[in-house]
Swiss-Prot record:
Residues reported in the UniProt entry to bind GTP: 10-12, 23, 51, 69, 99
Name this protein carries in UniProt: Molybdenum cofactor guanylyltransferase
Pfam families linked: NTP_transf_3
Gene: mobA
EC identifiers of the protein: 2.7.7.77
Domain notes: The N-terminal domain determines nucleotide recognition and specific binding, while the C-terminal domain determines the specific binding to the target protein.
GO MF annotation list: GTP binding; metal ion binding; molybdenum cofactor guanylyltransferase activity
Biological process terms in GO annotation: bis(molybdopterin guanine dinucleotide)molybdenum biosynthetic process
Family annotation (CDD domains): MobA
PANTHER family, per the entry: MOLYBDENUM COFACTOR GUANYLYLTRANSFERASE
Any single GO CC term annotated in Swiss-Prot or TrEMBL for this entry: cytoplasm
Summary of the function given for this chain in its UniProt record: Transfers a GMP moiety from GTP to Mo-molybdopterin (Mo-MPT) cofactor (Moco or molybdenum cofactor) to form Mo-molybdopterin guanine dinucleotide (Mo-MGD) cofactor.
Length: 196
């Protein structure tokens, strides 16, 4: 029996380094950043949720359910993950940021294979050099653990997942897959890379 996998795209941050612009809606090569992300993951999952804490109406125009953090105060990616984990009945939830327009087209199958090979609860993607703490495949049943971690004042995703049985899924063969956009300068460099 194949596993059912849903996804959440995290677009709930304040994007301070982008001058406060909503990163998911910033245009890259004529399309909103999040549209690039949607196009990469849509064929790999059953349902997509968009986690947004502002501009929810604009995000809804992409045709997917928009969810806002159940914890107020822009508490970071953990808050978005917790909310999404409570909105899915899938076997696994794929977590990706809204500003990674080059995500692997084989992201889900490789992360799922890594989980199954190790009988792990969580797979975290790696570019071969660094783990990508907000590119995860995890079991929604871990929600209570994550919620307790956040409510204890913790914010770092990697500090949470190291407490669980996790496996690293390497994408060293796609070193640019997780390039993201945090500044206008990075956006310009990425726009050039996409057109090459």
């Amino acid at each position: 029996m194949s596993s059912q996998i849903d996804a959440v795209i995290l677009a709930g941050g304040m994007a301070r380094r982008m001058g406060g612009d909503d990163k998911g809606l910033v245009e890259l090569n004529g399309e909103a950043m999040i549209k690039h992300t949607i196009d990469r993951i849509k064929p790999q999952v059953k349902e997509i949720l968009i986690n947004a804490n502002r501009n929810q109406t604009r995000y809804a125009e992409f045709g997917f359910k928009v969810i806002s953090d159940e914890h107020s105060g822009f508490l970071g990616p953990l808050a978005g993950m917790i909310t999404a984990m409570g909105q899915t009945d899938a076997d696994y939830l794929l977590v990706v940021p809204c500003d990674c327009p080059l995500l692997p087209l084989d992201l889900v199958p490789r992360m799922l294979a890594a989980i199954e090979a190790e009988k792990a609860e969580i797979a975290v993607a790696s570019d071969g050099e660094y783990e990508q703490p907000v590119v995860l495949l995890l079991k929604p049943s871990l929600r209570d653990s994550m919620k307790a971690f956040l409510e204890a004042g913790e914010r770092k995703v990697d500090f949470w997942y190291i407490k669980h049985h996790f496996v690293v899924a390497s994408f060293a063969d796609q070193p640019n897959a997780f390039v993201n956009v945090n500044t206008p300068e990075q956006k310009q460099r990425l726009a050039i890379k996409i057109t090459q």
